Design a protein with these regions (language model features):
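Conserved class I S-adenosyl-L-methionine
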Residues: 174-184
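Conserved SAM-binding loop of SAM-dependent methyltransferases across substrates and taxa
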Residues: 185-196
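Conserved SAM-binding loop
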Residues: 213-214
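A short glycine-rich, Lys/Arg-flanked "PGG" loop and its adjoining helix->strand segment in the class I
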Residues: 258-272
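Feature captures hydrophobic
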Residues: 1-159, 165
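Conserved beta-strand signature within the Rossmann-like core of class I S-adenosyl-L-methionine
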Residues: 271-279
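A short acidic, Gly/Pro-enriched loop at the edge of an enzyme's catalytic core
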Residues: 234-243
Length: 413
């Protein structure tokens, strides 16, 4: 048989994959056979399979099969990759929930976020080199959802607005002590110290990130005001006024939430206040298997209900919940555009398969937040005996003024 001609087996595999996908506006092509869905919607993309094994892997396991085949160049997508992934997320097709459940349980065991497991998982994603992340993040190297005051705001302006919002939600005051877990490259801790006069201890187990953060703090003359600690958050022992964690809960692991809650309680007692910013879902379900295996080992974005297991055991009062899903979609659009403009550089640094995998990861993330498959939650909370509770949300939208600070708080006791 000619290498350009499909067999009966190939056509059956295409038909099987179509049944899984349903009437998605995506054409499937293998050699001389083209499968077009029965839909009135315009075709958004054409998926071209280079060989039968690529098609077979996708028919058996769409998530992992497509991710690996696309990364290896055995599948090409002609058209809008983000839009095609949006269609997939919005459809009812795909592998069964039971299959996903079993796979998730296996990955939970394999990638358990113990102290040793967490270090391995974080190293896999965050220690890829600072030069790689510098290609497509903002100038302060923030790798979490930004806040766009306007649709036209730059990524740099939006990331600064996010840090300002975090500080305002916490209502930081000069002289207070703050502990941050999962501090990334250090931007938020440095911003807090410079703009709000607080003293910060920031924990991280990524060696590359913590080294970068320490050098940055030294250049800014913040010795004694910001301390970056290369250690697991579970080893935190000091007392603080404020606990803050941006983009770490999704790395904690569902079976470690109670342990995490005890760490927070140890830090702020029943009178402090805290803030969590994390990727989540509307309902409990596993993370995409390919993302979890290849990109984010140990990752789990919880539902809002699941995340309450961090607050309820310690009798923390949840004061405010906000969803910035569309802000993360826009953040990712900026990252993706910068990544694409640096694609050839990424290939030279990491290889073509790596570059294609990360393109797919970023495209898939844009699609997931646009469609609501993923959410971005910010939760403000306080100890049950915290003496200060914000009376209104006005402080989020007006500049900080020291002389009006007392008017914005009401004493709980």
């Amino acid at each position: 048989m000619s290498a350009t001609t499909t067999s009966g087996t190939d056509r059956k595999l295409l038909a099987a994959l179509r049944r899984k996908l349903g009437p998605l506006p995506i054409a499937l092509v293998l050699r001389d056979t083209r499968d077009v869905p029965e839909t009135s919607e315009p075709i958004v993309a054409t998926v071209r399979f280079q060989d039968r094994p690529a098609l077979l892997s996708l028919a058996k396991d769409p998530d992992r099969g497509f991710g690996d085949a696309y990364s290896a160049g055995r599948v090409e997508v002609d058209g809008d990759l983000v839009r095609s992934l949006e269609c997939v997320y919005l459809s009812r097709g795909g592998i069964s929930r039971w299959h996903k459940f079993l796979l998730a349980k296996w990955l939970d065991w394999l990638q358990n976020n113990t102290r040793r497991g967490s270090r391995a998982n974080i190293h896999h994603h965050y220690d890829l080199s600072n030069d790689f992340y510098r290609l497509w993040l903002d100038e302060r190297m923030l790798y979490t959802c930004a806040y766009f005051p306007t649709l036209e705001a730059s990524l740099e302006a939006a990331q600064e607005a996010k840090m300002e919002m975090v500080c305002r939600k916490l209502r930081l005051r000069p002289g207070e002590t703050v502990v941050e877990t999962g501090c990334g490259w250090g931007a938020l801790a440095i911003y807090m110290a410079q703009h709000y006069g607080v003293r910060v201890k920031a924990f991280n187990i990524s060696h590359e990130q913590i080294t970068y953060a320490r050098q940055w703090a030294k250049r800014e003359g913040l010795t004694g005001k910001v301390e970056f600690i290369e250690d697991d958050y579970r080893n935190l022992s000091d007392k603080f006024d404020v606990f803050c964690s941006v983009g770490m809960l999704e790395h904690v692991g569902r079976n470690h939430y109670y342990e995490f809650s005890r760490v927070i309680r140890r830090a702020i007692g029943d009178t402090g206040r805290g803030f969590l910013h994390y990727i989540g879902r509307n309902s409990a379900r596993p993370l995409n298997a390919w993302i979890r295996e290849r990109i984010f080992p140990g990752g789990y974005p919880p539902s809002l209900r699941e995340s309450m297991d961090v607050f309820e055991p310690q009798n923390f009062s949840v004061l405010d919940v906000e969803n910035l899903r569309m802000h993360y979609a826009k953040t990712l659009e900026h990252w993706l555009a910068r990544f694409e403009s640096s694609f050839d550089t990424v290939v030279r640094m990491k290889g073509l398969e790596f570059a294609r995998a990360w393109r797919l990861y970023l495209c898939g993330s844009v699609a997931a937040f646009r469609t609501g498959s993923l959410q971005l939650f910010q939760v403000l909370f306080a100890g049950s005996r915290s003496p200060f509770i914000v009376w209104t949300r006005e402080h989020l939208y007006v500049p900080f003024e020291e002389d009006t600070d007392r008017e914005l708080w009401t004493r709980a006791m």
